[in-house]
Amino acid sequence: MADKIRYGVTLYSYSNEYVNGILSFEEILRTVKAQGYTGIELVASQMVPGYPYPSDEWLAQLKALLEEIGLEPVCWSAYIDMGIRSDRDLTEDEIIQFTVNDLICAKKAGFPMVRTQHAISPKIFRKMIPFCKQLDMKLTIEMHHPHHPEVPVWKELIEIMRG
């Protein structure tokens, strides 16, 4: 049935099993499929070896494994580590570089969308549009407490999203 609702799950839901070695990454994917989910959100900083710079080989293996299992890669969740340096926060250019890197990695693994965090300012979000178009990728932003759609920064982000 073409209009049947499909269910996806964030692999963050399996954090305990993964972090404590109860299930391997592949076992989690197979469990997700066995539980009836069709799509996944991958929290890259948690489950991608070498993140934020995973190997092309690993990304290709992930894509092949998802195809083999029959899971749809829906969302690559990025993490902008503003504290990666001890002497300062990331610059605007560094945030852009990290975000472009996530878009490229997600694309290689077959994910059509990257979800990033609210460390992306409206100014940076606007600057990401050409990269998204070039890569044919979507960039979304996590709305996190205490934010909501009526917060001024979110009003501006939503306007950018509307084009």
Explain the meaning of each model-derived region.
Residues 1-38, 63, 67, 96, ...:
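Histidine-acidic metal/acid-base catalytic patches
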Residues 16-18, 46-50, 82-88:
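A short acidic, helix-capping loop that chelates divalent metal ions and anchors anionic groups
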Residues 23-24, 52-60, 87-100:
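Glycine-rich anion/phosphate-binding loops
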Residues 41-67:
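Glycine-rich, proline-tolerant flexible connector loops at the mouths of alpha/beta enzymes
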Residues 67-72, 83-163:
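Active-site acidic/histidine proton-transfer and metal-coordination neighborhood
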